[in-house]
């Protein structure tokens, strides 16, 4: 009797390698690894999955799709969870879940497995996404079921011939993609401990960053960054290039105690050099091109979208509707932002746009001023009329 097939989200690490051995007793395991911009050795991971016991192994480079369909909407929405975290890991989980479901359909698998623990956000993100895409698929979470200590897991691995990585004594848990790098555990679990330099991987410290500022011109077309210093490139490549440039200058270090979806607080160290530089540049072009009412209303939806994405609801009608609104606002977001990178800071120091609503003749205080100041008298009277009437009725001046 043939076994059911299970699709395993495979990283090549100890947890998911042990999961193959554990799952293959009851399933034919099909391992799937995706590169969302962390620079994995896909060939090595492909072969390792087969060596450990998978019957098939898929490796997928999804950087371009991730950048265009997931990162770009978040960039255009200035998506920060709790006004601080640019949703690094939260953005990659929906595309990973989507690809797992696609391969399940392709191979006839009935079940999807992931390597998340029972106290993190990612278990929720994967399982809610899978249920949204195909509720008939079953989900198993070996690591959550084991509840093993690290020592017990290593003992099981050795007993079953699973290679134990040489860097297993690394105290940190790291997740990385195009949009940044997330780090937790070890000394970071005490929020009073300053994060040591060894906890950072893609940014220089501001103290060791170059003593000379660097300027980067970011070109936007309909809200999408399309060129750095005039050189056009694919979005995924542009983000990676900005990661290198801004990371060199110490941009994008974030130390955050956040409220997890599962109800606990967690101290996280994020490095998002490209994200912070591009988010900063994009906001400045919006400030130049969007009318006041859109500029004031859009942040309300941005905050709601950030919460939806963080809280595992990418495949929600609410998320789809907000992204559609955001996309509509981007038609006029064209131009160039000049970003100054220096000692941990990304600052826009100049900007221009063919869609600019900034009129120098209206704004100037020189003799070139074309603003009709006499019109201000009637405007002020009408603008303040409701407040004036309320005061006269409810708070008459007491002589």
Swiss-Prot record:
PROSITE patterns, per database record: ARGININOSUCCIN_SYN_1, ARGININOSUCCIN_SYN_2
Residues involved in ATP binding: 9-17, 115
Transmembrane segments: none
Keywords: Amino-acid biosynthesis, Arginine biosynthesis, ATP-binding, Cytoplasm, Ligase, Nucleotide-binding
EC number: 6.3.4.5
GO molecular function terms attached to this record: argininosuccinate synthase activity; ATP binding
Residues where L-citrulline binds: 85, 121, 125, 173, 258, 270
Catalytic reactions of this protein: L-citrulline + L-aspartate + ATP = 2-(N(omega)-L-arginino)succinate + AMP + diphosphate + H(+)
GO cellular component: cytoplasm
InterPro entries the record matches: Arginosuc_syn_C, Arginosuc_syn_N, Arginosuc_synth, Arginosuc_synth_CS, Arginosuc_synth_type_1_subfam, AS_cat/multimer_dom_body, Rossmann-like_a/b/a_fold
One biological process term in Gene Ontology: argininosuccinate metabolic process
Pathway: Amino-acid biosynthesis; L-arginine biosynthesis; L-arginine from L-ornithine and carbamoyl phosphate: step 2/3
Subunit (UniProt): Homotetramer.
Record-linked NCBIfam families: argG, PRK00509.1
Protein name: Argininosuccinate synthase
Organismal lineage: Bacteria, Bacillati, Bacillota, Bacilli, Lactobacillales
